[in-house]
Amino acid sequence: MEHEQELREFTISSVNELGLTAGEVHAEQFMRYLIHLIEWNKTINLTSIIDPMEIIIKHFVDSLVALVATSFPQNGVVLDAGSGGGFPGIPLKIMRPDLRLVLVEPVLKKCSFLNSVIGLLKLEDVSTFDGTIEQYAKQPPRHVIDMVVVRALKYEEIRKHIPALLTSKGKVVLYRAGAIKNEEIGIDFHLVSEIALMLPQGFGKRVITVIEKNI
């Protein structure tokens, strides 16, 4: 890829600007992911963003904001609802390889892409499910989920299916543009925290809302 070294340095500096610690190993994985994403995006609609630097900030770094806003349990099981091109799940896994990840994606071609990324990056303890959250919830339990991350989907549309997936006191991490309203949270959950953070390079604000299962 043209300007690859510049993009590596840009990735490291942008992630570090969040308050995380990224090095060459992380940059290598993000670059391989970036190149693979751009190539597959030529035939599958994975993202409308085509500029590499914008992908780095608006997808990779944006996905990592949750690591600053809240704590993820060591070796915790995290379900990415509507993973699409792998956001936020795969960037989270790159920075937190201890996490056990479930990527739920209903579009078969996108699920194929996710499986190819898992193989390319040699990611361990990552599985995919070709279906919706509703369909996943109806399956025999595969994992006890500690956290559900929701970035691409509307939380209100999948809210009723989430409680059955979560362990007691399990959490949902919502990537939002603005604050959540009390009536949007639902009777099965309560608000734990809500933090607004600015993305690096002046790319705007991201709100991370964390809600917890009541029992």
Name each model-derived stretch.
Residues G85-D98, K160-I162:
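Conserved SAM-binding loop of SAM-dependent methyltransferases across substrates and taxa
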Residues D98-R100, P106-I215:
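S-adenosylmethionine
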Residues V65, F87, P91, K109-S112, ...:
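Conserved SAM/SAH-binding loop-helix junction
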Residues M1-N75, L79, S116-V126:
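Class I SAM-dependent transferase core
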Residues G82:
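Conserved glycine-centered beta->alpha loop in an early N-terminal alpha/beta scaffold
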